[in-house]
Swiss-Prot record:
Gene Ontology biological process terms in this record: D-allose catabolic process; galactose catabolic process; lactose catabolic process via tagatose-6-phosphate; pentose-phosphate shunt, non-oxidative branch
Organism this protein belongs to: Streptococcus pneumoniae (strain Taiwan19F-14)
Keyword Isomerase belongs to the record: yes
Subunit structure: Heteromultimeric protein consisting of LacA and LacB.
Name of the protein: Galactose-6-phosphate isomerase subunit LacB
Biological or metabolic pathway of the protein: Carbohydrate metabolism; D-galactose 6-phosphate degradation; D-tagatose 6-phosphate from D-galactose 6-phosphate: step 1/1
Keywords, in A-Z order: Isomerase, Lactose metabolism
Molecular function GO terms recorded: galactose-6-phosphate isomerase activity; ribose-5-phosphate isomerase activity
Enzyme Commission number: 5.3.1.26
Gene: lacB
Length: 171
């Protein structure tokens, strides 16, 4: 399995630790940088990771910045990416099993290296569990990302909101 990884200058050391962990587990790591602490901008590396995943160069991606918010927003702008910003196992597994996430994002100054490694390994081994409901949710996400004309419809999310109101979704 090939895993693309990228970060900004704030978490280079954390990214290197994660990269070494993945290599020790036998994964091929495609490291898009950054490689030092020279100030840079996370959108560059989020985009590179996202493009590697959607092109098939990598099977999954890992993005890390200080809080995870910036790089995760950047990678999610790449059409075809479904990235989840996580800091716990439950969220990571939900993202992969229910939403077929193909990138996982972390705040390297929020989540410790060992926990990131444990979560990434679980994310890699988790499998998407398709259902009619999550297929519809993923389709809605894809319609938004492709600027589908339906998204200008004021009722675009009505079906899901009605199901929520009826108690069909549970936290």
């Amino acid at each position: 399995m090939r895993i693309a990884i990228g970060c900004d200058h704030i978490v280079t050391d954390e990214k290197m630790a994660v990269s070494e962990f993945l290599k020790s587990k036998g994964y091929e790591v495609i490291d898009f940088g950054t490689y030092d602490h020279t100030r840079t901008h996370y959108p560059i590396f989020g985009k590179k990771v996202g493009e590697a995943v959607t092109s098939g160069q990598a099977d999954l991606g890992v993005c890390i910045c200080g809080t995870g918010v910036g790089i995760n927003n950047a990678v999610n702008k790449v059409p075809g990416v479904r990235s989840a910003l996580v800091r716990d196992m439950t969220t990571a597994l939900y993202a992969k099993e229910q939403l077929n996430a193909n990138v996982i994002g972390f705040g390297g100054k929020i989540t410790g290296e060992l926990l990131m490694c444990d979560i990434i390994e679980a994310f890699i081994h988790a499998e998407y569990k398709p259902s009619e409901e999550n297929k519809k949710l993923i389709a809605k996400i894809e319609h938004v990302e492709t600027h589908n004309a339906q998204q200008t419809d004021a009722n675009f999310f009505t079906e899901f909101l009605e199901k929520w109101d009826r108690g069909e979704y549970h936290d």
